[in-house]
Protein backbone atom coordinates (compact mmCIF):
# COMPACT_ATOMS: atom_id res chain seq x y z
CA UNK A 1 0.00 0.00 0.00
CA UNK A 2 1.30 3.44 -0.96
CA UNK A 3 0.03 6.70 0.53
CA UNK A 4 1.05 10.17 -0.61
CA UNK A 5 0.51 13.00 1.89
CA UNK A 6 0.36 16.70 1.08
CA UNK A 7 0.11 19.43 3.67
CA UNK A 8 2.28 22.00 5.31
CA UNK A 9 3.23 25.54 6.03
CA UNK A 10 2.43 25.30 9.74
CA UNK A 11 2.60 22.60 12.39
CA UNK A 12 -1.21 22.56 12.45
CA UNK A 13 -1.19 21.11 8.94
CA UNK A 14 1.86 18.88 9.34
CA UNK A 15 1.19 17.16 12.67
CA UNK A 16 -2.14 15.59 11.60
CA UNK A 17 -0.43 14.15 8.52
CA UNK A 18 2.36 12.70 10.66
CA UNK A 19 -0.14 11.27 13.13
CA UNK A 20 -2.05 9.53 10.34
CA UNK A 21 1.13 8.33 8.63
CA UNK A 22 2.54 6.89 11.84
CA UNK A 23 -0.74 5.17 12.70
CA UNK A 24 -0.99 3.59 9.25
CA UNK A 25 2.57 2.34 9.63
CA UNK A 26 1.69 0.84 13.03
CA UNK A 27 -1.30 -0.98 11.58
CA UNK A 28 0.31 -1.96 8.27
CA UNK A 29 4.08 -2.05 8.55
CA UNK A 30 4.65 -2.56 4.82
CA UNK A 31 2.94 0.73 3.90
CA UNK A 32 5.05 3.10 1.81
CA UNK A 33 4.56 6.74 2.81
CA UNK A 34 5.72 9.79 0.88
CA UNK A 35 5.14 13.51 1.41
CA UNK A 36 4.88 16.58 -0.80
CA UNK A 37 5.54 20.05 0.59
CA UNK A 38 7.33 23.32 -0.05
CA UNK A 39 10.87 24.23 0.88
CA UNK A 40 9.62 27.34 2.72
CA UNK A 41 7.23 25.51 5.05
CA UNK A 42 7.97 23.81 8.36
CA UNK A 43 7.50 20.46 6.63
CA UNK A 44 10.91 20.87 4.99
CA UNK A 45 12.46 20.11 8.37
CA UNK A 46 9.75 18.24 10.27
CA UNK A 47 9.03 15.53 7.71
CA UNK A 48 12.64 14.34 7.15
CA UNK A 49 13.21 14.55 10.92
CA UNK A 50 10.26 12.18 11.35
CA UNK A 51 11.85 9.69 8.97
CA UNK A 52 9.68 10.15 5.90
CA UNK A 53 10.80 11.10 2.36
CA UNK A 54 9.49 14.33 0.87
CA UNK A 55 9.41 16.00 -2.54
CA UNK A 56 8.96 19.73 -2.99
CA UNK A 57 6.86 21.83 -5.32
CA UNK A 58 6.78 25.59 -5.71
CA UNK A 59 3.49 27.16 -4.66
CA UNK A 60 2.34 29.98 -2.40
CA UNK A 61 -0.90 30.82 -0.65
CA UNK A 62 -3.44 33.28 -2.03
CA UNK A 63 -3.70 36.67 -0.37
CA UNK A 64 -7.18 37.80 0.66
CA UNK A 65 -7.11 40.75 -1.75
CA UNK A 66 -6.15 41.31 -5.35
CA UNK A 67 -2.46 42.10 -5.52
CA UNK A 68 0.70 41.30 -7.43
CA UNK A 69 1.30 38.46 -4.99
CA UNK A 70 -2.12 36.96 -5.77
CA UNK A 71 -1.47 37.15 -9.51
CA UNK A 72 1.97 35.61 -9.04
CA UNK A 73 0.46 32.74 -7.04
CA UNK A 74 -2.16 32.13 -9.73
CA UNK A 75 0.59 32.04 -12.35
CA UNK A 76 2.45 29.38 -10.33
CA UNK A 77 -0.47 26.95 -10.17
CA UNK A 78 -0.19 25.28 -13.61
CA UNK A 79 3.46 24.46 -12.97
CA UNK A 80 2.63 23.26 -9.44
CA UNK A 81 -0.08 20.94 -10.78
CA UNK A 82 2.31 19.63 -13.45
CA UNK A 83 5.02 19.01 -10.84
CA UNK A 84 2.48 17.25 -8.64
CA UNK A 85 1.42 14.97 -11.49
CA UNK A 86 5.06 14.06 -12.10
CA UNK A 87 5.55 13.11 -8.44
CA UNK A 88 2.30 11.13 -8.39
CA UNK A 89 3.14 9.19 -11.56
CA UNK A 90 6.57 8.33 -10.17
CA UNK A 91 5.39 7.22 -6.70
CA UNK A 92 2.14 5.59 -7.92
CA UNK A 93 0.13 6.04 -4.69
CA UNK A 94 -3.02 4.08 -3.93
CA UNK A 95 -4.48 7.18 -2.28
CA UNK A 96 -3.52 10.83 -1.80
CA UNK A 97 -4.27 12.51 1.53
CA UNK A 98 -4.18 16.27 2.13
CA UNK A 99 -4.12 17.85 5.57
CA UNK A 100 -4.49 21.51 4.71
CA UNK A 101 -2.28 24.37 3.69
CA UNK A 102 -1.91 25.70 0.18
CA UNK A 103 0.52 22.95 -0.88
CA UNK A 104 -2.19 20.31 -0.84
CA UNK A 105 -4.23 22.23 -3.44
CA UNK A 106 -2.27 21.37 -6.59
CA UNK A 107 -1.34 17.90 -5.31
CA UNK A 108 -4.89 16.73 -4.60
CA UNK A 109 -6.27 18.43 -7.69
CA UNK A 110 -3.66 16.61 -9.78
CA UNK A 111 -4.49 13.30 -8.10
CA UNK A 112 -8.21 13.80 -8.70
CA UNK A 113 -7.55 14.51 -12.38
CA UNK A 114 -5.51 11.30 -12.55
CA UNK A 115 -8.46 9.36 -11.04
CA UNK A 116 -6.53 8.44 -7.89
CA UNK A 117 -8.59 8.27 -4.66
CA UNK A 118 -8.31 11.48 -2.66
CA UNK A 119 -9.13 12.60 0.87
CA UNK A 120 -8.59 16.00 2.43
CA UNK A 121 -8.67 16.45 6.20
CA UNK A 122 -9.82 19.83 7.56
CA UNK A 123 -8.93 20.44 11.19
CA UNK A 124 -10.74 23.75 11.75
CA UNK A 125 -14.43 24.50 12.28
CA UNK A 126 -14.25 27.03 9.43
CA UNK A 127 -12.54 25.37 6.45
CA UNK A 128 -9.69 27.16 4.74
CA UNK A 129 -9.90 28.33 1.14
CA UNK A 130 -7.87 25.35 -0.10
CA UNK A 131 -10.28 22.87 1.47
CA UNK A 132 -13.30 24.74 0.12
CA UNK A 133 -11.94 24.56 -3.42
CA UNK A 134 -10.78 20.95 -3.13
CA UNK A 135 -14.10 19.80 -1.66
CA UNK A 136 -15.55 19.92 -5.18
CA UNK A 137 -12.91 17.56 -6.57
CA UNK A 138 -11.77 15.11 -3.88
CA UNK A 139 -13.56 11.87 -3.05
CA UNK A 140 -13.93 12.66 0.62
CA UNK A 141 -13.57 15.51 3.11
CA UNK A 142 -12.76 14.40 6.66
CA UNK A 143 -13.64 17.12 9.16
CA UNK A 144 -12.07 17.59 12.56
CA UNK A 145 -14.89 19.71 14.03
CA UNK A 146 -18.45 18.79 13.06
CA UNK A 147 -19.51 22.43 12.60
CA UNK A 148 -17.32 22.54 9.50
CA UNK A 149 -19.67 20.57 7.27
CA UNK A 150 -22.06 23.50 6.77
CA UNK A 151 -19.31 25.54 5.09
CA UNK A 152 -18.55 23.00 2.33
CA UNK A 153 -21.93 22.32 0.70
CA UNK A 154 -20.37 21.22 -2.60
CA UNK A 155 -18.38 18.33 -1.12
CA UNK A 156 -19.04 14.89 -2.62
CA UNK A 157 -18.77 13.14 0.72
CA UNK A 158 -18.15 14.45 4.25
CA UNK A 159 -17.23 12.32 7.25
CA UNK A 160 -16.57 13.47 10.80
CA UNK A 161 -13.30 11.98 12.06
CA UNK A 162 -12.07 14.50 14.62
CA UNK A 163 -8.47 15.68 14.71
CA UNK A 164 -5.60 13.28 15.47
CA UNK A 165 -3.91 13.70 18.86
CA UNK A 166 -0.59 12.54 20.24
CA UNK A 167 -1.10 8.98 21.58
CA UNK A 168 0.99 9.81 24.64
CA UNK A 169 -1.60 12.25 26.00
CA UNK A 170 -4.17 9.44 26.18
CA UNK A 171 -2.06 7.11 28.33
CA UNK A 172 -1.61 9.31 31.42
CA UNK A 173 -3.91 8.72 34.40
CA UNK A 174 -5.12 11.85 36.17
CA UNK A 175 -4.34 10.58 39.68
CA UNK A 176 -0.81 9.58 38.69
CA UNK A 177 -0.28 12.93 36.96
CA UNK A 178 -1.38 14.89 40.03
CA UNK A 179 0.84 12.78 42.25
CA UNK A 180 3.81 13.36 39.93
CA UNK A 181 3.29 17.13 40.18
CA UNK A 182 2.75 16.92 43.94
CA UNK A 183 -0.64 18.65 43.73
CA UNK A 184 -3.07 19.13 46.60
CA UNK A 185 -6.84 19.66 46.50
CA UNK A 186 -6.66 23.23 45.20
CA UNK A 187 -7.71 23.77 41.56
CA UNK A 188 -4.73 23.31 39.24
CA UNK A 189 -4.82 25.80 36.36
CA UNK A 190 -2.43 25.62 33.42
CA UNK A 191 -1.99 28.50 31.01
CA UNK A 192 -0.30 28.57 27.61
CA UNK A 193 -0.65 30.69 24.51
CA UNK A 194 1.33 28.50 22.14
CA UNK A 195 4.95 27.51 21.61
CA UNK A 196 5.88 30.96 20.29
CA UNK A 197 3.89 32.80 22.94
CA UNK A 198 1.26 35.51 22.61
CA UNK A 199 2.09 38.95 23.96
CA UNK A 200 -1.34 40.30 24.94
CA UNK A 201 -2.50 36.88 26.14
CA UNK A 202 0.59 36.60 28.34
CA UNK A 203 0.18 40.10 29.76
CA UNK A 204 -3.39 39.48 30.86
CA UNK A 205 -2.55 36.04 32.25
CA UNK A 206 0.39 37.46 34.23
CA UNK A 207 -1.80 40.25 35.60
CA UNK A 208 -4.39 37.70 36.72
CA UNK A 209 -1.76 35.55 38.41
CA UNK A 210 -0.49 38.64 40.24
CA UNK A 211 -4.02 39.45 41.41
CA UNK A 212 -4.57 36.00 42.95
CA UNK A 213 -1.03 35.14 44.07
CA UNK A 214 -1.48 36.11 47.71
CA UNK A 215 -4.76 34.24 48.04
CA UNK A 216 -3.05 30.89 47.37
CA UNK A 217 -6.38 29.63 46.01
CA UNK A 218 -4.86 27.91 43.00
CA UNK A 219 -1.88 25.93 41.82
CA UNK A 220 -0.79 27.61 38.60
CA UNK A 221 1.53 26.53 35.78
CA UNK A 222 2.14 28.97 32.92
CA UNK A 223 4.09 28.36 29.73
CA UNK A 224 5.04 31.71 28.22
CA UNK A 225 6.30 30.52 24.85
CA UNK A 226 9.55 31.51 23.23
CA UNK A 227 10.68 34.59 21.25
CA UNK A 228 11.66 36.49 24.44
CA UNK A 229 8.15 36.03 25.85
CA UNK A 230 9.48 34.59 29.11
CA UNK A 231 11.53 37.71 29.84
CA UNK A 232 8.56 39.96 29.03
CA UNK A 233 6.30 37.99 31.37
CA UNK A 234 8.81 38.02 34.21
CA UNK A 235 9.16 41.79 33.78
CA UNK A 236 5.38 42.04 34.02
CA UNK A 237 5.49 40.22 37.36
CA UNK A 238 8.27 42.49 38.59
CA UNK A 239 6.34 45.59 37.52
CA UNK A 240 3.40 44.29 39.58
CA UNK A 241 5.67 43.72 42.57
CA UNK A 242 5.35 39.94 42.47
CA UNK A 243 8.39 37.69 42.86
CA UNK A 244 7.17 34.30 41.61
CA UNK A 245 10.17 32.58 43.21
CA UNK A 246 8.55 33.21 46.60
CA UNK A 247 5.38 31.31 45.66
CA UNK A 248 5.65 27.54 45.61
CA UNK A 249 2.17 27.28 44.07
CA UNK A 250 3.09 29.32 40.97
CA UNK A 251 5.41 28.00 38.25
CA UNK A 252 6.36 30.06 35.21
CA UNK A 253 8.41 28.48 32.43
CA UNK A 254 9.18 29.17 28.81
CA UNK A 255 7.74 25.88 27.69
CA UNK A 256 5.71 23.14 29.39
CA UNK A 257 7.79 20.11 28.49
CA UNK A 258 5.67 17.57 30.39
CA UNK A 259 2.47 18.71 28.70
CA UNK A 260 0.91 15.24 28.73
CA UNK A 261 1.19 15.11 32.52
CA UNK A 262 0.18 18.75 33.04
CA UNK A 263 -2.91 18.55 30.82
CA UNK A 264 -4.19 15.39 32.47
CA UNK A 265 -3.53 16.75 35.97
CA UNK A 266 -5.20 20.11 35.31
CA UNK A 267 -8.63 21.08 36.56
CA UNK A 268 -8.83 23.95 34.08
CA UNK A 269 -6.86 25.03 31.01
CA UNK A 270 -6.56 28.60 29.72
CA UNK A 271 -5.28 28.62 26.15
CA UNK A 272 -5.63 29.68 22.54
CA UNK A 273 -8.07 27.76 20.34
CA UNK A 274 -5.94 26.08 17.70
CA UNK A 275 -7.43 22.89 16.30
CA UNK A 276 -4.69 20.63 17.71
CA UNK A 277 -5.02 22.11 21.20
CA UNK A 278 -8.79 21.66 21.17
CA UNK A 279 -8.45 18.10 19.91
CA UNK A 280 -6.28 17.27 22.92
CA UNK A 281 -8.50 19.11 25.40
CA UNK A 282 -11.62 17.30 24.24
CA UNK A 283 -9.88 13.93 23.87
CA UNK A 284 -9.19 13.95 27.62
CA UNK A 285 -12.34 15.87 28.60
CA UNK A 286 -10.72 19.00 29.97
CA UNK A 287 -12.71 22.18 30.82
CA UNK A 288 -11.17 25.28 29.28
CA UNK A 289 -11.21 29.04 28.97
CA UNK A 290 -10.39 29.76 25.35
CA UNK A 291 -8.91 33.00 24.06
CA UNK A 292 -8.99 32.78 20.24
CA UNK A 293 -6.08 34.40 18.45
CA UNK A 294 -7.39 37.28 16.33
CA UNK A 295 -4.33 37.08 14.09
CA UNK A 296 -5.01 33.81 12.24
CA UNK A 297 -6.40 33.47 8.73
CA UNK A 298 -10.20 33.56 8.38
CA UNK A 299 -10.53 33.91 12.17
CA UNK A 300 -10.26 30.11 12.43
CA UNK A 301 -9.74 30.07 16.18
CA UNK A 302 -12.90 32.05 16.90
CA UNK A 303 -14.95 29.47 15.00
CA UNK A 304 -13.14 26.61 16.76
CA UNK A 305 -13.65 28.12 20.22
CA UNK A 306 -17.32 28.91 19.69
CA UNK A 307 -17.97 25.32 18.60
CA UNK A 308 -16.58 24.03 21.91
CA UNK A 309 -18.46 26.74 23.81
CA UNK A 310 -21.76 25.74 22.18
CA UNK A 311 -21.09 22.17 23.24
CA UNK A 312 -20.67 23.28 26.85
CA UNK A 313 -17.00 22.37 27.16
CA UNK A 314 -15.46 25.83 27.38
CA UNK A 315 -15.91 29.51 28.12
CA UNK A 316 -14.64 31.99 25.52
CA UNK A 317 -13.01 35.36 26.13
CA UNK A 318 -12.28 37.40 22.97
CA UNK A 319 -8.82 38.93 23.13
CA UNK A 320 -10.36 42.43 22.95
CA UNK A 321 -12.07 41.67 26.28
CA UNK A 322 -9.13 39.87 27.88
CA UNK A 323 -7.93 41.23 31.21
CA UNK A 324 -7.09 40.05 34.71
CA UNK A 325 -10.68 40.87 35.67
CA UNK A 326 -12.31 38.89 32.84
CA UNK A 327 -10.03 35.91 33.47
CA UNK A 328 -10.81 35.97 37.18
CA UNK A 329 -14.54 36.11 36.54
CA UNK A 330 -14.38 33.14 34.18
CA UNK A 331 -12.10 31.06 36.41
CA UNK A 332 -14.17 31.77 39.52
CA UNK A 333 -17.41 30.92 37.73
CA UNK A 334 -16.06 27.53 36.63
CA UNK A 335 -14.03 26.27 39.59
CA UNK A 336 -16.34 27.58 42.33
CA UNK A 337 -18.80 24.83 41.48
CA UNK A 338 -17.56 21.25 41.45
CA UNK A 339 -20.73 20.33 39.59
CA UNK A 340 -20.02 22.82 36.81
CA UNK A 341 -16.41 21.71 36.52
CA UNK A 342 -17.45 18.08 36.13
CA UNK A 343 -20.24 19.00 33.72
CA UNK A 344 -17.88 20.99 31.48
CA UNK A 345 -15.40 18.12 31.50
CA UNK A 346 -18.13 15.69 30.49
CA UNK A 347 -19.30 18.00 27.70
CA UNK A 348 -15.74 18.44 26.49
CA UNK A 349 -15.22 14.67 26.37
CA UNK A 350 -18.42 14.23 24.34
CA UNK A 351 -16.82 16.33 21.59
CA UNK A 352 -13.49 14.52 21.76
CA UNK A 353 -12.35 11.86 19.31
CA UNK A 354 -9.44 9.96 20.89
CA UNK A 355 -9.41 7.46 18.02
CA UNK A 356 -9.34 10.10 15.27
CA UNK A 357 -6.23 8.70 13.59
CA UNK A 358 -7.86 5.26 13.42
CA UNK A 359 -11.02 6.76 11.92
CA UNK A 360 -9.03 8.52 9.21
CA UNK A 361 -7.03 5.36 8.50
CA UNK A 362 -10.32 3.50 8.08
CA UNK A 363 -11.51 6.05 5.53
CA UNK A 364 -8.21 5.88 3.65
CA UNK A 365 -8.46 2.08 3.41
CA UNK A 366 -12.10 2.31 2.35
CA UNK A 367 -11.17 4.60 -0.54
CA UNK A 368 -8.41 2.23 -1.64
CA UNK A 369 -10.71 -0.81 -1.50
CA UNK A 370 -13.44 1.06 -3.35
CA UNK A 371 -11.03 1.83 -6.18
CA UNK A 372 -9.83 -1.77 -6.64
Question: Language model features by range: what are they?
Answer:
Residues 114, 264-266, 280-292:
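Conserved donor-binding/catalytic loop of nucleotide-activated donor transferases
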Residues 353-372:
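C-terminal alpha-helical cap of glycosyltransferases
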Residues 3-7, 30-81, 193, 320:
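Conserved nucleotide-sugar phosphate-binding/catalytic loop shared by glycosyltransferases and other
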Residues 31, 42, 53, 112-175:
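Active-site-proximal region of nucleotide-activated glycan assembly enzymes
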Residues 85-96, 104-119, 132-137:
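Glycosyltransferases and closely related glycan-assembly transferases
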Residues 41, 46, 174-176, 182-269, ...:
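Donor-nucleotide binding loops and adjacent catalytic segments primarily
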Residues 340-354:
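A short, well-ordered alpha-helix in the C-terminal region of glycosyltransferases
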Amino acid sequence: MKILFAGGGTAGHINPALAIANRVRELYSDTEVHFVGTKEGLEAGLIPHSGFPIDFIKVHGFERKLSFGTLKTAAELPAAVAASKKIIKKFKPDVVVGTGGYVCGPVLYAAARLKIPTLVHESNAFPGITTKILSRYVDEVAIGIDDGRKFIPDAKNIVFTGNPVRPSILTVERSAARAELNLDDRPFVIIFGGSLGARDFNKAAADWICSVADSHKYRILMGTGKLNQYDAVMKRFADNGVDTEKYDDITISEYIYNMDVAMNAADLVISRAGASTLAELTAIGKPAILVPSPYVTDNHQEHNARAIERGGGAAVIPEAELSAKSIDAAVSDIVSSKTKLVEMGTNSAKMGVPDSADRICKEVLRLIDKNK
